[in-house]
Amino acid sequence: MEHRGISQGDHHRVLHEIKLDRQALIDFYHMFPKETHLPWNEFKLKYNSNNPYRRNLTDKFKMVYAPAYEGKELIDYPIIQELISKFNFRNPLIVTDVQILTYDAGFKFKTHIDAEVNWSMFIPLIPKDGGEPLVYHQGNNHRDPGPEIYRVHYSIEHPTLTT
């Protein structure tokens, strides 16, 4: 089964109530020089020196390390604060809760289980079509996640909440 546009399933919901200023977010992303795009493993070490190395996440999977640009965390920028203000989070967000992920050409996620994540909110900016879909599998075994349940093609107009 494939979900596109305004949709909801067992593990996702497109938050159609929240309209994004996509161009403003793209402009914000482009503000950060390529030198701030660190490989995932290197980025994680900036916040936790004991973070284990993940060999499946190659140097083509990166995250913007905002402090390398102006010394501020992503969460400290007004555009991010304005976005956060649209939600009523039970617990205040911390600096590592807001991330900009980037993928170099040719990067593809391998089938995996996100053990560290309870939920995520995705706001794809580039490419224009929202990129590769998120694929849910039936099982919870890291070595064999089981058959595919469904795919979610991210909305580019509204955040997509996933579990």
Which positions does each model-derived feature cover?
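Non-heme Fe(II)/2-oxoglutarate
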Residues: 1-91
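Catalytic core of non-heme Fe(II) oxygenases with the double-stranded beta-helix
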Residues: 92-163
